[in-house]
Swiss-Prot record:
Protein name: Ubiquitin-fold modifier 1
Propeptide: 88-90
Originating species: Brugia malayi (Filarial nematode worm)
Membrane spanning residue stretches: none
GO BP terms: protein K69-linked ufmylation
Family the UniProt entry places it in: Belongs to the UFM1 family.
Keywords: Isopeptide bond, Ubl conjugation pathway
Gene Ontology cellular-component terms listed: cytoplasm; nucleus
Lineage: Eukaryota, Metazoa, Ecdysozoa, Nematoda, Chromadorea
InterPro entries: Ubiquitin-like_domsf, UFM1
Role summary: Ubiquitin-like modifier protein which binds to a number of as yet unidentified target proteins.
Cross-link named Glycyl lysine isopeptide (Gly-Lys) (interchain with K-? in acceptor proteins), sites: 87
Record-linked Pfam families: Ufm1
Length: 90
């Protein structure tokens, strides 16, 4: 009997676009979240190197975890933002 691989689904919204488009991505729980970030950025045609993912509450997410851990800690609704808006203060 094959072991079923658990998947998690994220709804990622692009906050830099006024229309707030979103993508729904389903990935295996063990997927590195850096790969999810990169794929989401490519789907929205924004540079992954200058993008970050935050929660709907504005909490930054460290992408060096598995997708399963991110899902358990932060849920399924996330936001993709340009990194120049992270922690910026005048």
């Amino acid at each position: 009997m094959e072991h079923a691989v658990g998947k998690v689904t994220f709804k990622i919204t692009l906050t830099s676009d006024p229309k707030l488009p979103f993508k729904v991505l389903s990935v295996p729980e063990s997927t590195p979240f850096t790969a999810v970030l990169k794929f989401a950025a490519e789907e929205f045609k924004v540079p992954a190197a200058t993008s970050a993912i935050i929660t709907n509450d504005g909490v930054g997410i460290n992408p060096t975890q598995s997708a399963g851990n991110i899902f358990l800690k932060h849920g399924s609704e996330l936001r993709l933002i340009p990194r120049d808006r992270v922690g910026y203060c005048e």
